[in-house]
Amino acid sequence: MATIGRRAYAEMFGPTVGDRVRLADTNLIIEVEDDYTLRAGGYGEEVKFGGGKTIRDGMAQSQRSRAEGAVDTVMTNALIIDHWGIVKADIGLKDSRIVAIGKAGNPDTQPGVDIIIGPGTEVISCEGSIVTAGGFDSHIHFICPQLIEEALSSGITTMTGGGTGPATGTFATTCTPGSWHIERMLQAADAFAMNLGFMGKGNASLPAALHEQINAGALGLKLHEDWGTTPAAIDNCLNVAELTDTQVAIHTDTLNESGFVEDTLAAFKGRSIHTFHTEGAGGGHAPDIMKLVGEPNVLPSSTNPTRPYTVNTLDEHVDMLMVCHHLDAAIAEDLAFAESRIRKETIAAEDILHDLGAISIMSSDSQAMGRVGEVIIRTWQTAHKMKAQRGWLAPPPERSEPVEKLQRNDNYRVKRYLAKYTINPALTHGMAHEVGSIELGKWADLVVWRPAFFGVKPSLIVKGGSIAMAAMGDPNASIPTPQPVHYRPMFGAFGGALARGSLTFVSQAGLNAGIGARYGLSKTLSAVKNIRGIRKEHMVHNHYLPKMEIDAQTYSVRADGELLTCEPAVSLPMTQRYFLF
């Protein structure tokens, strides 16, 4: 039998079981755990497109039509990184969804084929490339529509939050207030190759106006201190959420005017809630909002400007806060408000709480103390910093492999951090039946990366099975690669293909009320569901519940008695090596 060297094989078909890959210029190393393309019984039946390759008529391409089972698109030899594993596989796409993860080819000439390639099948060659699920940013201030293209080009395919544009309320708070604005934003969502959903304003002490917003299609409600996050408003908002199976996101009371963190926790009454920027620099009970990380009903997230803690973090935050919350540096009380939120001790602890899996979600806080295009970059920078400062991260003790074998890779840490911007926000907001992972039946939102550019600059962004964005060269060139290469919208982002390739998430009440027809919407509407039963224990790889202690005088943070502190990073990967600015 003919053989091929491991290096030559990886160069031709991509890495296989036991091969290791470095992610960008970080210190993170992944190792391939399984190879689904070997279901034919071993090596030698791989598929590959190109001159002299195997995906040709009568070889790995069958005669079968779409009706006879051939897929619309096959992504060949992809290195999948997802919360459930790091595997090599072919991926079959059909009707905008993922229909198979396994071995592609021609079942008439090859064994073990579970993805049929036919004359009607397109090929995206992923040999040597990484494929991840599209990212999910759950903390969006919809200040300008250009945010969406910026996020898409970074690998984000789902965005939820609130706003109406550059209105003063939207600059500060993440809500689309009232049924009229919700209708307008849902109509605007039809223009974008992005899964979108909007949260209504949750600050009210009586339920009628909140139900009105949910019935109008808001997928949840947002409580923000700038609108008055009192215990009465919290309780009322959660009452409505419980009745409508929607999520509540909260920005708590920095000034402790209407109560302390203990009062807010009491108002939760054990009900599930998504706490935004749980460290507190983005807002929340000063100085101890981070205590909520240890509560079983709290689904905690971070926003990216504090990720990770660096020598520049503190200096940039005060100015950001003054602008975002309509404060005046000439007013002493406004300045004191800003400075009370920026604490190096809690920001440093936030790094470690992410590494421990105690903070479950990463998000941006776009243009409102956060950078919409940097959710993914800053997640991996945090992972890199934590490996550099805390060493290798051991997987759960149920893993039976020898420690020496496990220490060859960072697979567990990589799965933990990936889950923070994929499956966990999807679970939190009731969308995991559609998005958040590479699994059968889910919407085909996939991001292709060259390993050297992983987390920094994707090669392709696939939305609902169509390529919606890509790093593309000069359109007048004779080939696709000449400079200037930059992100450009592709055919999946135009015309009717745009509407077929993306989802708009709404409440079940709104869907039942027929808002799609009433508002004249063209995108497919999907109702959020199974939200109210979600707890911290359901956060994949990120469900640690420490007993939190925060000293009100020194701001020192302890988790289960351990002092959490680390040095700021002086330099980071995924920065100047990739960007001019």
UniProtKB/Swiss-Prot annotation:
Q: Which residues bind Ni(2+) 1?
A: 139, 141, 222, 365
Which reaction does this enzyme catalyse, per its entry?
A: urea + 2 H2O + H(+) = hydrogencarbonate + 2 NH4(+)
Report the co-factor binding details. Answer: Binds 2 nickel ions per subunit.
Q: How is it modified after translation?
A: Carboxylation allows a single lysine to coordinate two nickel ions.
Residues that bind Ni(2+) 2:
222, 251, 277
- Catalytic residues of the enzyme: 325 (proton donor)
* Urease domain segment(s): 134-581
Q: What is its main location?
A: cytoplasm
Provide this UniProt record's keywords sorted from A to Z: Cytoplasm, Hydrolase, Metal-binding, Nickel
Q: In which pathway does it act?
A: Nitrogen metabolism; urea degradation; CO(2) and NH(3) from urea (urease route): step 1/1
* One GO cellular component, as annotated: cytoplasm
Its recorded name reads Urease subunit alpha
Q: Which organism is it from?
A: Albidiferax ferrireducens (strain ATCC BAA-621 / DSM 15236 / T118) (Rhodoferax ferrireducens)
Organism lineage: Bacteria, Pseudomonadati, Pseudomonadota, Betaproteobacteria, Burkholderiales
Q: Gene of origin?
A: ureC
